[in-house]
Regions:
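C-terminal interaction surface of TIR/SEFIR-family domains
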Residues: 1-7, 18, 103-163
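A short helix->loop->beta-strand "cap" motif at the edges of active sites that frequently abuts
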Residues: 88-92
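Conserved N-terminal substructure of TIR/SEFIR domains
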Residues: 1-63, 148-163
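Conserved TIR/SEFIR loop-to-helix hotspot centered on a Trp-containing motif
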Residues: 71-87, 104
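Short, glycine/charged-enriched secondary-structure capping and boundary segments
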Residues: 21-24, 79-82, 107-109
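Short beta-alpha junction loops
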Residues: 95-103
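Conserved beta-strand segments of the P-loop GTPase G domain that flank and frequently precede/overlap
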Residues: 9, 66-69, 95-96
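Short, solvent-exposed loop/turn segments at secondary-structure junctions
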Residues: 13-15, 72, 99-100
Length: 163
């Protein structure tokens, strides 16, 4: 089986450890983990720098895996990554990671599905950030993009399910 080139979207502060666990599974070939120092350097340069970093790292990736933690849906840059991926025609899928343990061995609460925040115009395939379709020509992104919610509470079982 050929490994996919993927871009991982996640809330860095809350879920970087969990994202590392998913990356280490080896099921897919993804981008190299960004260090907190690198991310802080990009953030310091402002919004345009962040957008360029995301756009560059998403290039040549065939899909985006949104690792859904407790606050992913509320994060500006996670939402930007979802919109950008859709506009670029990349596959988009979500995996709930709240039951994987973080670096301190703690699990989190389940977050909202970030795909619920977007609608797609069925005629033009245009993505817009709002929760409810404006008319019959729009569909909620959550009806298109699949999410995987491991049915386990024990972190090792969640890890095995994702694997």
């Amino acid at each position: 089986m050929i490994k996919r080139q993927v871009f991982y979207s996640f809330h860095f502060k809350n879920d970087s450890w969990r994202a590392g666990q998913v990356r280490n599974i080896g099921v897919v070939e993804g981008n190299m983990p960004v260090s907190s120092n690198d991310w802080e350097e990009v953030k310091r340069k402002g919004d345009d720098s962040i957008k360029r970093w995301i756009d560059t790292h998403m290039d040549y990736r065939s899909c985006v895996i949104v690792l859904i933690g407790s606050d992913t849906a509320s994060r500006e840059w996670c939402r930007y990554e979802i919109k950008h991926a859709w506009k670029e025609g990349k596959g988009v899928v979500g995996i709930y990671v709240h039951n994987l343990k973080n670096i301190e061995g703690e699990q989190d609460i389940k977050g909202d599905n970030p795909f619920n925040l977007f609608c797609i115009d069925k005629t033009f395939n245009y993505i817009i950030e709002h929760k409810h379709p404006a008319d019959s020509n729009e569909i909620n992104l959550s009806e298109i993009c699949k999410t995987y919610d491991p049915p386990y509470k024990i972190s090792t079982n969640v890890y095995d399910y994702i694997k």
